[in-house]
Design a protein with these regions (language model features):
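Non-catalytic cap/lid and distal C-terminal segments of serine-dependent acyl enzymes
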Residues: 1-233
Length: 233
């Protein structure tokens, strides 16, 4: 079954897009759940429109929940909306009130592509008691601190702004403020160190296409995980 429409969020204080795909058959027990996060230019329908998700979900035991988070990088924005709070705190309650979804950590995953991959990691690591699995595909930015320092240094140069994307620079300033001061949860490697020390690491799946623009960043990131002794697939 596919459901696509909008839901009112108290945290966002507005209606926001929401798409849900469920298995075709009812089951006696609770369903597992995966929150699927879209990329920078996508929306809640992206996974429905550009993947075979309904076919995969039809015979399974998992409900797939796809929120709309704009260009927020799934953060609580300095100038904007608290999308991380919505996705990690309010949305699961909304979905459990509509469907027979398990609240157990081992039955809950979060996944995403590009901006959504970064968002999945960020959400899973800021709420490690909520997610037993995180999947990140062609994710960016995996090194947020370095990215913001580069924008601080070169962002006012016309050639850099044109190459990097003026719209994206504005996005990051909306998220972190004009000074681009990162919040504590923005740097994924730092969060991994913290969650590992708490012995709360979720299962981690990482992948990236060989010709993807994020491939170099992906290789640097997985290399860092190897050195840190953090397991992933």
């Amino acid at each position: 079954m596919r459901l696509s429409g909008s839901v009112y969020s108290k945290i966002l204080d507005m209606d926001t897009g929401l798409t849900i795909v469920t298995p075709n058959k009812l089951r006696e027990g609770k369903y597992k759940v995966v929150y699927l996060l879209h990329g920078l230019c996508g929306n809640d329908r992206s996974w429905l429109d550009y993947s075979m998700l309904p076919a995969y979900a039809a015979k399974g035991d998992t409900v797939y929940v796809m929120p709309d988070a704009g260009r927020s990088f799934y953060s609580n924005m300095k100038y904007g909306f608290d999308y991380q709070g919505y996705v990690t705190e309010e949305l699961p309650v909304i979905c459990r009130n509509m469907f027979n979804i398990s609240a157990a950590r081992e039955d809950t995953g979060i996944m995403g592509c590009s901006m959504g991959g970064y968002g999945a990691l960020r959400c899973a690591l800021t709420h490690p008691d909520s997610y037993g699995f995180v999947g990140a595909f062609s994710s960016g930015p995996l090194f947020a601190r370095a990215g913001m320092e580069e924008i601080k240094k070169y962002g006012d140069l016309p050639d850099y702004a044109e190459r990097f994307g003026l719209r994206l620079i504005k996005d990051f300033k909306a998220i972190y403020g004009d000074a681009l001061e990162l919040t504590d949860d923005a740097e994924i490697l730092d969060m991994l160190v913290k969650v590992k020390a708490e012995n709360k690491l979720p299962r981690i799946y990482l992948t990236c296409g060989r010709d993807d623009a994020f491939m170099k960043e992906h290789e640097l990131f997985t290399g860092a995980l190897d050195k840190m002794g953090i397991p992933y697939e």
